[in-house]
């Protein structure tokens, strides 16, 4: 059940207890465990009962005027508080504003002004978190919040990010937002979630970019966790467009390269031949030969691949595997 923020009486002290905010879920998204709960601090607002007397048209006009960028920069603390209250008191209205390009920019300008204003916006963001972080323009509000919010609010945001990480990473706009904040203080926890979902993400049009980003950070612990999650699936991934991108990155460092090549050598000869002629796999088999030939510490890997591929040399010459055939020719 979503909770509405109440407007406190004039000079009412800040209370540390605050109703928990539960998030609605978009259609077609199943969440196996309950969303994280957030207990933001309420803000000491002056009496805004006059808002109830405004017609919808008057309220809309006030909001349009208030959202002017130049006016935002001139607002005092009380007017900022009024502005934030108008924008955040209705979750759906806030979402509508945040999804608008200009609305998103203006909300971002309001963030980081005062802690009380930030408390209102943090609560509003968390009520519609998944909708906001996966939107083209609204996602920038989350990114800005993760830059200017205090530790308590950032922690609440990160709990939601961790909870929805798999959904966010597979969204066109969400994965870009995730990439922007992936190096923050909670990155190890986020990396653990990503590694756990590595197989699903590797096969996804957008999720594979998140896996690539984590791998390229060269965080040994996270890379090992991803390799463990993907072990036994490298051949299957190599046949797929998005999965092949991930395998390509894994072939670039010695430790992960060894695991991938060993798995290639374990597959049946016919399977390796099909991979070598595959639209995506041929490039990876060729790269595996090149990196193992260059890294002669494990000569057994290079010669193992050569011996498995040689029987198919003629088939490879007249297919997508012609570059592989050229390598085999060069070592005769």
Curated annotation (Swiss-Prot):
The keyword Ribosomal protein does not apply. GO terms for molecular function: mRNA binding. GO terms for cellular component: cytoplasm. Keywords: Cytoplasm, Repeat, RNA-binding, Translation regulation. Pfam families: PUF. Gene3D superfamilies: Leucine-rich Repeat Variant. It comes from the Eukaryota. Residues 1-332 form the PUM-HD domain. It is found in: Cytoplasm. The keyword 4Fe-4S does not apply. Pumilio repeats lie at residues 89-124, 125-159, 160-191, 192-228, 229-266, 267-303. GO terms for biological process: post-transcriptional regulation of gene expression; regulation of translation. The pumilio repeats mediate the association with RNA by packing together to form a right-handed superhelix that approximates a half donut. The number as well as the specific sequence of the repeats determine the specificity for target mRNAs. Sequence-specific RNA-binding protein that regulates translation and mRNA stability by binding the 3'-UTR of target mRNAs. This is Putative pumilio homolog 20. The gene is APUM20.
């Amino acid at each position: 059940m979503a909770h509405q923020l109440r407007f406190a009486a004039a000079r009412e002290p800040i209370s540390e207890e605050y109703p928990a905010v539960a998030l609605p879920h978009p259609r077609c998204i199943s969440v196996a465990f309950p969303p994280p709960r957030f207990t933001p601090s309420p803000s000491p607002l002056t009496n805004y009962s006059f808002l109830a007397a405004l017609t919808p048209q008057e309220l809309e006009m006030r909001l349009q005027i208030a959202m002017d960028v130049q006016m935002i920069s001139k607002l005092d603390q009380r007017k900022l508080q009024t502005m934030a209250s108008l924008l955040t008191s209705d979750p759906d209205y806030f979402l509508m504003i945040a999804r608008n390009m200009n609305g998103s920019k203006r909300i971002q300008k309001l963030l980081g002004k005062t802690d009380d204003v930030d408390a209102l916006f943090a609560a509003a963001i968390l009520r519609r978190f998944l909708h906001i972080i996966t939107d083209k323009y609204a996602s920038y509000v989350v990114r800005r919040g993760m830059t200017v919010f205090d530790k308590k609010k950032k922690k609440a945001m990160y709990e939601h990010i961790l909870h929805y990480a798999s959904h966010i990473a597979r969204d066109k706009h969400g994965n870009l937002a995730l990439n922007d904040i992936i190096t923050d203080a909670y990155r190890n926890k986020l990396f653990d979630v990503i590694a756990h979902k590595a197989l699903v993400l590797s096969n996804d049009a957008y999720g594979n970019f998140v896996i690539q980003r984590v791998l390229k950070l060269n965080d040994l612990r996270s890379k090992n966790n991803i390799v463990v999650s993907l072990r036994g699936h490298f051949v299957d991934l190599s046949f797929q467009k998005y999965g092949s991108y991930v395998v390509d990155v894994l072939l670039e460092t010695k430790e992960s390269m060894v695991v991938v090549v060993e798995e290639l050598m374990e597959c049946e000869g016919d399977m390796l031949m099909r991979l070598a002629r595959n639209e995506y796999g041929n490039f990876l088999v060729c790269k595996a030969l090149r990196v193992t030939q260059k890294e002669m510490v494990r000569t057994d890997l290079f010669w193992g691949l050569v011996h498995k591929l040689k029987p198919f040399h003629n088939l490879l010459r007249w297919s997508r595997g012609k570059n592989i055939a050229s390598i085999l020719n060069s070592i005769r």
